[in-house]
Structures are given as structure tokens and as C-alpha cells.
Amino acid sequence: MSCEEIAVCAVRLRENLCLYFEELECDAFCKDKTIKRFFRNVNSQLLVVRPDLNVAAFEDVTDQEVKSGSGMYFDIHCYKTTAPSARMPVAFSVQVEDKSYYMCCEKEHGKMVVRFREGEVPKDIPGESNIIFFKKTFTSCSSKAFKFEYSLEQGMFLAFEEEDSLRKLILKKLPREDEVDETTKFVTSHNERHNL
């Protein structure tokens, strides 16, 4: 730690009694709460993680599969940050059988891909991280649908793409942040029978 003095100007005191400053970068994320949700795409399919196949895809699932919840019932870990923002930093994890997997983004063959790695989501994240996404409402008139922007690359969103008869979870670059792209639309629900 340095003894150097840094002059800062307070900007505002928000309702959570956190003091925010101008021109300071976010230097850490601290886990605030965790909520459990299913993810659906615009086709009402559930997101299912299959680590043994190294794939996460939206699928039509049977009632029996849904009851087990294995690979489908996600923990959304909400983080606090030191920067005031309308975007909520989140990370994702899911239980498959008796193991926990967290979502991360990695570069493979020059392309960013979504992966699920065995392990737990950290309580505190110092600095940047390949597991953080920013949760945003999909459109102003669609408060129950969301899109998730990758924290390390602006304009890169979670989406789905048809590949070998699967709707795989991918990262997709949008030319404009306000572009309405249905492949980046996700509905979260605590009930597997939720309809779009």
C-alpha cells in the first residue's frame, strides 16, 4: 500500500449507503446474494449443461429430467461493485449430479467460447474476471427478459446458435449495444413451467 495521497471527489451517496467517487475504476467484485433460476430461450427451451460432453445447449426436456434439475437449475451469483452502474455484475454456476460447475469464457482457436469448469464461484473477485457478466434488461418494455454482456469485452453477449441440431450457448458480438437480437434474450424463472 502506498502513502501517496490521492484527491477524490465524492459524487453521491446511494440508497445502499455506499459512497461513490468520480473517475475511480472498479477494482473488485464482492458477492452480494445468490438466486436460483432456470434459463429459457425464445423457443421456451431450457438451458442444460452437460460437462461430460463439454456442451451447454437449450433443449426440450422431459418432466422427469426437469424434476432432477441436474445441469438445469442455475445459481446466479450477484456481485456488488465499487462503480455505480445500471448493470448488475453476475456469475453463474450449476450443479450436475454431485459436482458444481461455474461458467467462464476462454479463447480457443482465436475465438471466445463459453465453458463450464468444475469448482465454486469465488466470494470476492479482485479486478477483472472471465466469469463476470453484466445483467441488463433485454428491452425497456421487456422487464422479465435479460441479456448478459461479457465483462471483459464490451458488446459481447451470451446467446444461442444452431449447431448440429443443438442450440448451443455461445458468445456473440453485437455491432450496437441497443440492437435487438432474439438469440441474446434469456428469461429466468424459479419455476421450470414458466412460459414466455
Swiss-Prot record:
The pro-IL-18 precursor is processed by CASP1 or CASP4 to yield the active form. Keywords: Cytokine, Cytoplasm, Secreted. InterPro entries: IL-18, IL-1_fam, IL1/FGF. GO terms for molecular function: cytokine activity. Residues 1-29 form a propeptide. Its main location: cytoplasm. One of its GO terms (biological process) is establishment of skin barrier. Gene3D superfamilies: 2.80.10.50. It comes from the Eukaryota. One of its GO terms (cellular component) is extracellular space. It is found in: Cytoplasm; Secreted. Pfam families: IL1. Forms a ternary complex with ligand-binding receptor subunit IL18R1 and signaling receptor subunit IL18RAP at the plasma membrane. Mature IL18 first binds to IL18R1 forming a low affinity binary complex, which then interacts with IL18RAP to form a high affinity ternary complex that signals inside the cell. Interacts with cargo receptor TMED10; the interaction mediates the translocation from the cytoplasm into the ERGIC (endoplasmic reticulum-Golgi intermediate compartment) and thereby secretion. Belongs to the IL-1 family. Augments natural killer cell activity in spleen cells and stimulates interferon gamma production in T-helper type I cells. Involved in transduction of inflammation downstream of pyroptosis: its mature form is specifically released in the extracellular milieu by passing through the gasdermin-D (GSDMD) pore. This is Interleukin-18.
